[in-house]
């Protein structure tokens, strides 16, 4: 689950991470009131959306007066902001963070991520802050410092000090930087984060180490024990199809292609997307119906897939282990009738009751193309949507 920058800073502040004073605003009048309460000579007006690249896209403004704050708020609120992470459709700005300005001397990058190769949390840092860390990794990878953290003992002070020196934090501020990194790590662990990214971390003119921006993502599977984090959820920032899918315990992620996929099992779903790409197609989604799908669940899955206007065909790829192929076949037939499906539909079934499942499909009288293998199914659906 993602949250807004201002929410992330609220969390970090509780852990002792230094952040600028700021207030959220939903209207221009609230923005002005926030600036009055901050009493700063310079204000930063920041669009709050779940995407990076806001500054380059015009979503971050510097105001020197309260009138400018109001003007920027009127300009940004209700505007659709398009960044490299939003896609061409962009995101509507519905809230702003009004912050006091900072006298920035130097920008750095500090982040905590889960490294799947080592199954450990990794602290990453760079003196090249304020830019996309992916760009730094591509152009100057030697400027990224990485520390693998032992989960049994956590981030140690000596590790944080080593990182601070390697990214050239001023010597007199190393102590602050160590406290910053260890506090960030504590927040990461205790709040079940999957990403905690500070870009930039800044050194200010008055000698402070501060998080100028904050991106926190959380493990959705841990939200049952993070009730306070769940309250930060902003459904306006989420894909309506993904929200609908969650109501039926379906794992759905929207993609940019035109071939809808309905599969059971995350591994098979990823393999299905790969093989569609192999045959020259583009998957429109990741959709895992799980191991206990009912006819109702399959019908809802079809409706969600078809709510994507880009979908030109559907590939159903099911391996019946716990789930029986005849149950899936009945669900596919019922769903096809309910939604009045006119798009090409290819179904590949394998496993428990596979012959019965295939018979149900063939006896339905519907325009359903049967596939003998995953490769056969992928090749057929790619051909049908061209």
Curated annotation (Swiss-Prot):
Sorted UniProt keywords: ATP-binding, Ligase, Magnesium, Metal-binding, Nucleotide-binding, Tricarboxylic acid cycle
Protein name in the entry: Succinate--CoA ligase [ADP-forming] subunit beta
The ATP-grasp domain, residue ranges: 9-244
Purpose: Succinyl-CoA synthetase functions in the citric acid cycle (TCA), coupling the hydrolysis of succinyl-CoA to the synthesis of either ATP or GTP and thus represents the only step of substrate-level phosphorylation in the TCA. The beta subunit provides nucleotide specificity of the enzyme and binds the substrate succinate, while the binding sites for coenzyme A and phosphate are found in the alpha subunit.
Similarity comment: family membership: Belongs to the succinate/malate CoA ligase beta subunit family.
UniProt superkingdom: Bacteria
Organism for this UniProt entry: Bacillus pumilus (strain SAFR-032)
The protein's annotated pathway: Carbohydrate metabolism; tricarboxylic acid cycle; succinate from succinyl-CoA (ligase route): step 1/1
Cofactor: Mg(2+)
Binding partners and assembly: Heterotetramer of two alpha and two beta subunits.
Record-linked Gene3D superfamilies: ATP-grasp fold, A domain, ATP-grasp fold, B domain, Succinyl-CoA synthetase domains
């Amino acid at each position: 689950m993602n949250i807004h920058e201002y929410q992330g800073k609220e969390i970090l502040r509780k852990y002792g991470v230094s952040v600028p004073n700021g207030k959220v605003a939903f209207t221009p009048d609230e923005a002005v009131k926030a600036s009055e309460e901050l009493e700063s000579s310079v204000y930063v007006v920041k669009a709050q959306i779940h995407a990076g690249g806001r500054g380059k896209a015009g979503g971050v403004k510097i105001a020197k007066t309260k009138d400018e704050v109001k003007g920027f708020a009127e300009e940004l609120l209700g505007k659709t902001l398009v960044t490299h992470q939003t896609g061409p459709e962009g995101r509507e700005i519905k809230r702003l963070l009004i912050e006091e300005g900072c006298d920035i001397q130097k920008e750095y990058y500090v982040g905590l991520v889960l490294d799947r190769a080592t199954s450990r949390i990794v602290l990453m840092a760079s003196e090249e802050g304020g830019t996309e860390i992916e760009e730094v990794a591509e152009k100057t990878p030697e400027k990224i410092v990485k520390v693998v953290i032992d989960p049994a003992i956590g981030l140690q002070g000596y590790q944080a000090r080593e990182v601070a020196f390697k990214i050239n934090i001023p010597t007199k501020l190393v102590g602050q930087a160590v406290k910053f990194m260890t506090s960030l790590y504590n927040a990461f662990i205790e709040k079940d984060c999957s990403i905690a990214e500070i870009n930039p971390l800044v050194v200010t003119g008055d000698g402070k180490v501060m998080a100028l921006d904050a991106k926190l993502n959380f493990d959705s599977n841990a939200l049952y024990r993070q009730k306070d984090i769940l309250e930060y959820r902003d459904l306006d920032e989420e894909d309506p199809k993904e929200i609908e899918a969650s109501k039926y315990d379906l794992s759905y992620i929207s993609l940019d292609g035109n071939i809808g996929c309905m599969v059971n099992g995350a591994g098979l779903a990823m393999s299905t997307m790969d093989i569609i790409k192999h045959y020259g197609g583009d998957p429109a989604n990741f959709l895992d119906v799980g191991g206990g799908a009912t006819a109702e669940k399959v019908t809802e899955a079809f409706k969600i897939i078809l709510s994507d206007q880009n979908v030109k065909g559907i590939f159903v790829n099911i391996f019946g282990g716990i789930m029986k192929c005849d149950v899936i076949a009945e669900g596919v037939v019922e769903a096809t009738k309910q939604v009045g499906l006119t798009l090409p539909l290819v179904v590949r079934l394998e496993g428990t009751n596979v012959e019965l499942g295939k018979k149900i499909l063939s006896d339905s009288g519907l325009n359903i193309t049967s596939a003998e293998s995953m490769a056969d199914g992928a090749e057929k659906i790619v051909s049908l949507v061209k």
